[in-house]
Structures are given as C-alpha cells and as structure tokens.
C-alpha cells in the first residue's frame, strides 16, 4: 500500500450496478443468500479489469488466486427488481488480495450488505502458495495509485 502526501492510504475501487432479476430470488422475492457471492464476483471482475490484471491475465502470468476467506454481513434483504450498486475496493495487495465490498440500494444509497474476500497467490505450475503477489500485479496497482 502506498500512502499519499497527507499520509493516508489510497485504494482502487470499482462499482457494478444492476437490477436484481427474478431468477435470483426465492419464494419470498428476496435474493437467495448464495447469489451474494456471485454479485461480489461480478464487482471483483470489474475491479480486476480496471487494474489490468483479470483472471485471464492471472492465468497467463502463471498464477492462480483462489478465495481463501470470505465474510458476508447481511444488513438488509435485497429484493426482486431492486436496483443495487456493488462497490469493490482493493485494500491489500502486497501479500494477498483483500477486497472489501459494500452493496447499496442504487436509488436511496441505503447499505444492504458488507463483505470482504481474501485471495492467496498460488503458482499454477506446482500449486504452491506464494508469500507475495506477483510483481506484474503490484506494478499495475502502484501505477494506478500514482
């Protein structure tokens, strides 16, 4: 992480916005809890695209980034046909990828969900855990933070 001039830390963030489709809800018209993982993944993919190191680039560089930890706090139910905004923020990237998420109602900005995911770096050639993120990734992050 790189502090800026006022000694605060800069982060890279991206948003994914959509309207909840019918096939994501249960009989009560509330989003089934398992779909939250999908929503986080969609926002994470946009964030990684912004960085220039998406899952295809990861594989091409010889690394895998499996999820090793995930936490979701369901603050308020998400409903069928509700417009939502999923915000993903990269908060750690030197030794692992830690991304924090906030899901809000797009219209009222009410907080509906908070979450985070942690991804470890694994060498694809031998499935060994790496102690640092690849230099190609950290260079791209640092370039965006300038």
Predicted segments with their positions:
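HotDog/MaoC-like acyl-thioester-processing domains
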Residues: 2-6, 10, 14-16, 79-80, ...
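Catalytic strand-loop segment that frames the active site of acyl-thioester-processing enzymes
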Residues: 2-47
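Glycine-rich, flexible loop/turn motifs
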Residues: 18-21, 27, 54, 61, ...
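Hydrophobic beta-strand-centered segment that forms part of the acyl-chain substrate-binding groove
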Residues: 47-85, 89-97
